[in-house]
């Protein structure tokens, strides 16, 4: 695994995007809608580490509550704090307690795939997933496509059934975050050409 989660941090390529779209059976706007809502379409922090969100309730469940305490391990969601480097501070605390469970308790990359879903994303273990996520946004998006197919959410994306997609991808509390509404809005913008220029991002 790359030291401190730093790999090549290569930006999304046109070929990588096209491969994911073909795998999913969608066009560009559907994919950009998801990526825009999850990470504003960027899978890496400025320092080159993958975008993550550490989720304390997942860590609590995976460790059977052995470390329940404050912001890194609790039965209830929340306590995330700001996005960005702060999430790695939280992850570091969890890593010192149970490394594998900690990696599984964070969502990773451009589509924020949970580490515990590594198998559905196409990896033999979470360590392999994190290593790939640290290298390229192409690998991050490929993992998203694999997960959507394995979870049968690809059909909802193809049909623009944003409510069903939001429920499956974001969880039962999706409405609190207006997740489906935001997806619909981002899709509308992407459908009229408001999408990132991959050549500029490269």
Label for each model-derived stretch:
Residues 1-196:
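Catalytic glycan-binding domains that act on GlcNAc-containing polysaccharides
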């Amino acid at each position: 695994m790359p030291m401190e989660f730093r790999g090549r941090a290569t930006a999304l390529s046109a070929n990588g995007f096209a491969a994911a779209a073909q795998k999913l059976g969608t066009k560009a706007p559907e994919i950009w809608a998801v990526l825009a809502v999850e990470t504003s379409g960027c899978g890496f922090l400025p320092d080159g580490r993958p975008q993550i969100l550490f989720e304390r309730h997942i860590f609590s469940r995976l460790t059977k509550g052995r470390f329940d305490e404050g912001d890194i391990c609790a039965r209830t969601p929340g306590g995330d704090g700001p996005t960005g480097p702060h999430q790695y501070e939280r992850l570091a605390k969890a890593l010192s307690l149970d490394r594998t469970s900690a990696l599984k308790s964070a969502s990773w990359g451009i589509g924020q795939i949970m580490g515990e879903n590594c198998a559905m994303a196409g990896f033999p273990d979470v360590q392999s997933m994190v290593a790939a996520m640290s290298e390229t946004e192409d690998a991050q998006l490929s993992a998203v496509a694999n997960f959507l197919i394995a979870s049968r959410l690809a059909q909802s994306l193809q049909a623009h059934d944003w409510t069903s997609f939001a429920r499956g991808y974001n969880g039962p509390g999706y409405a609190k975050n207006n997740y489906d509404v935001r997806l619909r809005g981002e899709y509308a913008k992407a459908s009229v050409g408001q999408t990132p220029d991959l050549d500029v991002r490269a």
